[in-house]
Structure formats: C-alpha cells, structure tokens
C-alpha cells in the first residue's frame, strides 16, 4: 500500500484534469466522487487530502510516502523530504500586483513572506511585509498596503478587484515529493506510481 498526500483545492483539480487526460480513470473517479472524506482508497493507493501547506509535513513525518504539492509551498521553508519530480500540471506563478496607478511600494501584503522578502531584497527595495492568510487582494483594495505578492493563474481575481499584475516573480508548478525512508523501502511501488502518471524521472 502506498499512501499519498494530496493538496486540496486548485492543485487537486489540476491533478484530476491531468488524470483524465492520461486516462488514469480509477484514481480520477475516486477523487471526483469524494464527498467529505479526507482518506480515500483505490487500487493499492491510499490518498489523504490535506491543506497544501500540510502536505510536506505529512510526508516528512512519515504519515505519507508521497506528496503532490505546489512548489510555492516548498519554496517557503525547508522540509526534510526528497523533492523528486516536476509534474506536468498546476502551472501558475508568483507576481507583484497592485492598483494600475501604483509605482512605489512601502507595504506589501502576502501569504508568502519568504518569497516576497527574497524578491524585494534582490531588487534593493525596502518594504514592510504584512502576512495575511487569505484574500490578500482586499488589503490592497482598501489601501492597507501598496501592493501584494500572490499566486496568479488566470488573473481573473486580480481583475475582479481592480488590480493588475506589475511584476512576474517566479514560476510555480506541482511537485512530487517523497518521504526519505519510504523512497528506499517502497521504491518499487513509488516507481510504479510515477510510471502510472506517465512522468519520467528525467523531469527532476
């Protein structure tokens, strides 16, 4: 049995779409037909559905052998896991966004403090970072901050709130991570699962 931690929300939707494309029907249908279950079983796989930021923790602690998580989570802090493969779905990017007329930044709201701090330091810009846990666009709309650093996929949310993308920071994609011990103890099962996703180890 292989236990896989999967990030709920947008990334899981991207995973399901990808599974449909490669016709991995059993796993796709199991994820689609979940109700409120957080633990699902199919074939020789057990899926645990958790918040994105918790995926590497479950893997690190040995509660999951494999994790599928956005690279944004892995960029924010170090985890003792094997950061194994790029996955061909879940593409988006970090960006600085603000009102169209904004040209200078003193305060920035973000859920991704490390990414924002690294970016502005690299540009030699001294900003005050305010950490928020969601709806960072609102902080800019009500003028609490001059701009935000957030994940952008289509830009629809920015546009709906009267904001525009100012600078592209870095690309984000889904990553496959493994528990370090499980990578050796369950190498055959892990490699079999990777093959079933039609992903090559060359994508590391």
Curated annotation (Swiss-Prot):
Keyword Transferase among UniProt keywords: yes
UniProt enzyme class: transferase
GO molecular function annotations of the record: ATP binding; ATP phosphoribosyltransferase activity
Pathway connected to this protein: Amino-acid biosynthesis; L-histidine biosynthesis; L-histidine from 5-phospho-alpha-D-ribose 1-diphosphate: step 1/9
Gene Ontology annotations of biological process type: L-histidine biosynthetic process
GO cellular component: cytoplasm
The UniProt record lists the keyword Glycosyltransferase: yes
Reactions listed under catalytic activity: 1-(5-phospho-beta-D-ribosyl)-ATP + diphosphate = 5-phospho-alpha-D-ribose 1-diphosphate + ATP
Location in the cell: Cytoplasm
EC identifiers of the protein: 2.4.2.17
Keywords noted in UniProt: Amino-acid biosynthesis, ATP-binding, Cytoplasm, Glycosyltransferase, Histidine biosynthesis, Nucleotide-binding, Transferase
One Pfam family, short name: HisG
Superkingdom of the source species: Bacteria
Quaternary structure note: Heteromultimer composed of HisG and HisZ subunits.
Domain note: Lacks the C-terminal regulatory region which is replaced by HisZ.
Free-text function comment from the UniProt entry: Catalyzes the condensation of ATP and 5-phosphoribose 1-diphosphate to form N'-(5'-phosphoribosyl)-ATP (PR-ATP). Has a crucial role in the pathway because the rate of histidine biosynthesis seems to be controlled primarily by regulation of HisG enzymatic activity.
Name the UniProt record assigns to this protein: ATP phosphoribosyltransferase
Organism of derivation: Staphylococcus aureus (strain NCTC 8325 / PS 47)
Gene name linked to the record: hisG
């Amino acid at each position: 049995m292989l236990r896989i931690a999967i990030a709920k929300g947008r990334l899981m939707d991207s995973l399901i779409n990808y599974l449909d494309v490669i016709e991995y029907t059993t796993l796709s249908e199991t994820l689609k037909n979940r109700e409120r279950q957080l633990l699902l079983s199919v074939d020789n796989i057990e899926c645990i559905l958790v918040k994105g930021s918790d995926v590497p923790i479950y893997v690190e602690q040995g509660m999951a052998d494999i994790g599928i998580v956005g690279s944004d989570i892995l960029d924010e802090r170090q985890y003792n896991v094997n950061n194994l493969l790029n996955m061909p779905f879940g593409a988006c990017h970090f960006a600085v966004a603000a009102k169209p007329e904004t040209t200078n930044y003193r305060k920035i709201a973000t859920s991704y403090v490390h990414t924002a701090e690294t970016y502005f330091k690299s540009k030699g810009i001294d900003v005050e970072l305010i950490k928020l846990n969601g709806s960072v666009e609102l902080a800019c709309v009500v003028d609490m901050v001059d701009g935000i650093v957030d994940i952008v996929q289509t830009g629809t949310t920015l546009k709906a709130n009267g904001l525009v993308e100012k600078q592209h920071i870095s690309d984000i994609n889904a990553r496959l991570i493994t528990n370090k011990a499980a990578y050796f103890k369950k190498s055959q099962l892990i490699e079999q699962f990777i093959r079933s996703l039609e992903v090559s180890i060359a994508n590391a």
